[in-house]
């Protein structure tokens, strides 16, 4: 765990809710003072009212009644203060956690793809749920309790000195013993709370993975192995939790018993002093002091109770800050995408949907040049590896002229999808260059680069919402009519209109109520509504049956018309009309040409096409 985790958390809390926290502290001080005053008044109540009344033959209880009312008012004021600061802390807690979740989500959205490739999704979810909940307990309960306990110790200590110094010294000695014991037990359990939170994240990650892949688990009869793996992770969580709570849970009982010992010792010593008339110790003073002694020792027990919560919150905060400290996706691009129209023979920027695009390229002399968006995509001498010591692509050259359809084929792991990831700048290359209309893509803002590329990903992902919402995800300002037109273009309209509520049918669980082909069609419609200048179709038709594939291919041909298109497909029949087909093998392009020329060569592509060898 990084040092200063708790300091950083408290600094964030203070910066957002300074006024609220000041008012909370004032209320806590008020609560402590009113309670101490009530206890101190017991001395007056006993010595000045109760004892004289017991000795009087005709007692007058009016004075005692007024004294009791004063005590009741003091305690009532303490209750009001306690109620007020607790209500404020509830508001502060929920507001702070809301803001923190927003900060976490906004930062998560800025993280590079490699973070999600390397971090289990369930572990990230655990940060949003379990780790956030540890902060809820810390802010709403532990912090107020710790401040209240400290205030109680201070005010009680001062009051005890006023009443009797020898008994106060005795109480402080016992308090030191309690502090030493509490610190020792707390240090033994603290490090295990960090491991407990990490193990909890692993368990959640595994559960999320198993839920997502439950069909695969059942198809391959993997249930027993899945259960065994879960048992192992769960046992590790149980062990770390046991070690964390083994000492932490005995803190409260130990401190309570030490407090009782302190109370008994003070009672015995105080009684001896009172009976012998030392230090002017009256019955009222002794009763008030013993009550204060309870109040003096009780905060130590309360503090020990919060040690568990503080340790867990510190571990949770550490994981939260690990997420927040992840480096955001680097983007130093200056070139942006804009719509253009031709006015008096010149290209000018416009807000109209003209269907024509250009790159706004700021030059060193200060003027902005409009470069027509043609869709000329080139990779030259590209080397790339997800890890520096393991290259996935080797000296790759790809030339996609405007309006051309370029197809990539090859075995799984050959590097086809990696090429499209590089064009999107999900990853940056180690060597070579990638240009878009003659502009190095590192100069293009990532948002604009990706906006220019309509993508149908290999894994179709649909979001909870209506069919219309999922199509509109391609362009949020698209009208219903535009979404329907896009669906018709992808031939998705044929099945959507037969759904129970048509385009307003709710999809849940990643579109589990749709077939693979239907989900793929919606993904294509989503790309169509974006109306991008260029397209990347990653395994676009690999999940669609032959009949649906024919419908999709017809729609895709319309969508690809006039656009530069990069296609990855396992079904070679879908790419026969490509302008250029590139065959990849272990990160190298070993063949390139159109369908006819590659068939004539009778090389790897010919073998794939004739079925002599399998791609996967």
Question: What feature does the model see in each segment?
Answer:
Residues 57-58, 340-616:
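ABC-type nucleotide-binding domain
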Residues 94, 102-134, 205-229, 322-340, ...:
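Short intracellular "coupling" helices and adjacent cytoplasmic loop segments at the cytosolic face
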């Amino acid at each position: 765990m990084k040092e200063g985790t708790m300091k950083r958390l408290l600094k964030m809390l203070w910066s957002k809710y300074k006024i609220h926290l000041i008012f909370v502290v004032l209320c806590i001080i008020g609560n402590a003072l009113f309670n101490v005053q009530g206890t101190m008044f017991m001395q007056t109540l006993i010595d000045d009212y109760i004892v004289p009344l017991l000795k009087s033959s005709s007692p007058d209880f009016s004075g005692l009644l007024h004294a009791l009312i004063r005590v009741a008012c003091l305690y009532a004021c303490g209750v009001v203060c306690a109620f007020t600061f607790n209500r404020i802390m509830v508001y502060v807690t929920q507001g702070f956690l809301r803001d923190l979740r927003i900060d976490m989500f906004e930062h998560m959205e800025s993280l590079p793809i490699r973070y999600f490739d390397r971090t289990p999704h369930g572990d990230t979810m655990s940060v949003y749920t379990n780790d956030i909940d540890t902060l809820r307990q810390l802010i709403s309960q532990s912090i107020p309790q710790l401040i209240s306990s400290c205030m109680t110790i201070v005010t009680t200590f001062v009051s005890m000195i006023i009443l009797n110094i020898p008994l106060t010294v005795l109480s402080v000695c016992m308090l030191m013993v309690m502090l030493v014991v509490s610190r020792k037990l707390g240090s033994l359990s603290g490090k295990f709370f960090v491991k407990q939170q990490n193990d909890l994240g692993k368990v959640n990650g595994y559960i999320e993975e198993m839920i997502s892949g439950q069909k695969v688990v059942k198809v391959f009869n993997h249930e027993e192995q899945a259960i065994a793996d879960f048992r192992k992770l769960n046992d590790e969580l149980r062990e770390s939790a046991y070690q964390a709570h083994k000492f932490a849970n005995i803190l409260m009982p130990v401190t309570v018993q030490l407090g009782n010992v302190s109370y008994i010792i003070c009672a015995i010593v105080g009684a001896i002093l009172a009976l012998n008339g030392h230090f002017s110790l009256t019955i009222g003073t002794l009763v008030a002091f013993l009550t204060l002694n309870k109040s003096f020792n009780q905060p130590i027990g309360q503090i020990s109770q919060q040690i568990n919560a503080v340790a867990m919150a510190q571990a949770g905060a550490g994981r939260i800050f690990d997420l927040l400290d992840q480096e955001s996706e680097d983007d130093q691009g200056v070139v942006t995408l804009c719509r253009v129209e031709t006015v008096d023979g010149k290209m000018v920027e416009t807000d109209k949907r003209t269907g024509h695009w250009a790159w706004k390229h700021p030059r060193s002399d200060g003027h902005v040049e409009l470069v027509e968006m043609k869709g000329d995509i080139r990779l030259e001498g590209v080397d790339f590896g997800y890890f520096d010591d393991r290259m996935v692509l080797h000296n790759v050259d790809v030339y996609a002229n405007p309006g051309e359809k370029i197809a990539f084929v090859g075995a799984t792991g050959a590097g086809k999808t990696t090429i499209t990831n590089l064009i999107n700048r999900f990853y940056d290359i180690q060597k070579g260059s990638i240009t878009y209309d003659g502009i190095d893509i590192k100069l293009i803002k990532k948002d604009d680069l990706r906006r220019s590329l309509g993508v149908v990903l290999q894994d179709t992902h649909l979001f909870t919402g209506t069919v219309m919402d999922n199509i509109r995800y391609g362009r949020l300002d698209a009208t219903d009519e535009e979404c329907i037109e896009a669906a018709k273009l992808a031939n998705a309209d044929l099945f959507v209109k037969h759904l129970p509520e048509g385009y307003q049918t709710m999809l849940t669980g990643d579109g589990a109520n749709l077939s693979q082909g239907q989900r793929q069609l919606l993904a294509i419609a989503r790309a169509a509504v974006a109306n991008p200048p260029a397209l990347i179709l990653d395994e676009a038709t690999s999940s669609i049956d032959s009949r649906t594939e024919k419908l999709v291919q017809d729609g895709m041909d319309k969508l690809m018309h006039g656009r530069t298109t990069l296609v990855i497909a396992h079904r070679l029949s879908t790419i026969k009309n490509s302008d250029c087909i590139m065959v990849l093998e272990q990160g190298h392009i070993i063949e390139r040409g159109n369908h006819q020329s590659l068939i004539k060569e009778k090389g790897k592509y010919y073998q794939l096409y004739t079925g002599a060898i399998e791609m996967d």
